[in-house]
Design a protein with these regions (language model features):
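Boundary at the C-terminal end of the N-terminal hydrophobic targeting segment
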Residues: 61-66
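Core segments of cupin and vicinal oxygen chelate
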Residues: 69-72, 79-126, 163, 171-185, ...
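Bacterial N-terminal signal peptides
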Residues: 51-59
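Bacterial N-terminal signal peptides that target proteins for export
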Residues: 38-52
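Short, structured interface segments
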Residues: 181-202
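A cross-kingdom feature marking solvent-exposed beta-strand/loop segments within repeated
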Residues: 105-118, 130-155, 162-179, 198-202, ...
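Vicinal oxygen chelate
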Residues: 73-85, 120-122, 134-160, 179-184, ...
């Protein structure tokens, strides 16, 4: 509010550096800066309004920002819903396979309707995992989302996603440490957007994981148009490859597309849906320096190799089932 000789003016900055009106976020534990102007003597109302407007300009420009709202691929996590009671075994196997650390396990409600789950975050050099072991039935549509993308501004991200053609399956809601929403891209690709009250600070990844998508020829172009508009992803390759890449052996070809953005990498397989098990069950591909050594660590810690590429493949890779039911692709990074 502005008055000629008396002004009380307040706003705060969230941890990502964005300015907000205090009235919108009075219950959040953000780092904030409150500016109070009271009993200002000798300053005209016109000058005071100009000064206040100058302070607000950054907030206006950020809100209008149409650039990518991504923070970085190390903040984008694969969502893993483990079989009930298998969280210990899963976390132990992932850490022994990839290295890294995990946060303290907590029992929380991470959905907008009543539910309870154990939740734990695993940070590895090859990618991050948000792990859930629900103690209650899982509310729909949770469990179908592939991953979570950290965004700098939730409201702006929702606007951008909708403008790009995404459906908002779960409108933004508060969780214990921020806000979340679930969106769906053309082709039925679900993902969660999240924003933290206190901005996290994770080390850069040694290898950025791939979001692996299987789409039909009827929907892939719609997905690309929509997802690229939101993520500002660049097409790194778009080519025909042998269908042995997806475990088939009929000497056919499939279209494979690779994207890269600040949200991370995406590898798209355009298929007729005739996929041998376990292809299509994996959501993420992880790059490692030494595939044989990594697979040895995985199997020693309770994982099972379900499929492995042949020597004729362009990229050495394997599909691995970890304790708790999670299936991942692991591949040798180029040297």
């Amino acid at each position: 509010m502005f008055h000629d000789a008396h002004c009380v003016f307040s706003f705060y900055f969230s941890a990502d550096g964005k300015a907000h009106r205090k009235s919108r976020f009075t219950q959040e534990n953000n780092r904030y800066l409150e500016v109070i102007m009271q009993n200002i003597i000798g300053i005209s109302s016109r000058r005071l309004r100009i000064s206040a407007l100058a302070l607000l300009v950054p907030a206006v420009s950020w809100a209008a920002d149409t650039a990518s709202l991504a923070v970085g691929p190390q903040y984008d996590t694969t969502h893993v819903y483990v079989e009930r009671g298998k969280m210990d075994a899963f976390v132990d196997s992932i850490l022994k396979t990839f290295g890294g650390t995990s946060t303290e396990r907590v029992l929380v409600n991470v959905t907008p309707t009543p539910s309870k789950t154990y939740s734990q975050l695993i940070l590895t050099p090859a990618g991050s995992f948000s792990v859930f072991d629900f103690k209650t039935p899982i509310p729909h549509p949770f469990g179908a989302e592939r991953n979570g993308f950290l965004v700098r501004d939730m409201d702006a991200a929702i606007r951008q996603a909708r403008a790009a053609g995404a459906d908002v399956q779960v409108a933004p809601f508060d969780d214990p440490i921020g806000r979340d929403a679930v969106i769906q891209w053309p082709g039925g690709v679900n993902m969660q957007l999240y924003w933290h009250t206190k901005a996290p600070n994770y080390k850069p990844l040694l290898s950025v994981p791939e979001n692996r998508l299987y789409l039909s020829a009827y929907r892939v172009d719609d997905f690309l148009k929509s997802y690229q508009a939101f993520s500002h992803a660049t097409v790194m390759s778009d080519e025909q490859v042998s269908d042995t890449t997806i475990g088939r052996s009929d000497n056919g070809k499939i279209r494979q597309i690779e994207l890269d953005s600040r949200f991370g990498k995406t590898r798209i397989f355009v298929t007729d849906g005739h996929l041998p098990y376990p292809f299509g069950h994996e959501r993420t591909g992880y790059g490692v320096d030494d595939l044989p050594a990594t697979l040895a660590k995985a199997t020693a810690s309770g994982a099972q190799v379900l499929w492995r590429s042949t020597a004729a493949e362009r990229r050495a890779s394997a599909l691995v089932r970890f304790p708790g039911g999670y299936i991942a692709e692991i591949h040798q990074t180029a040297k």
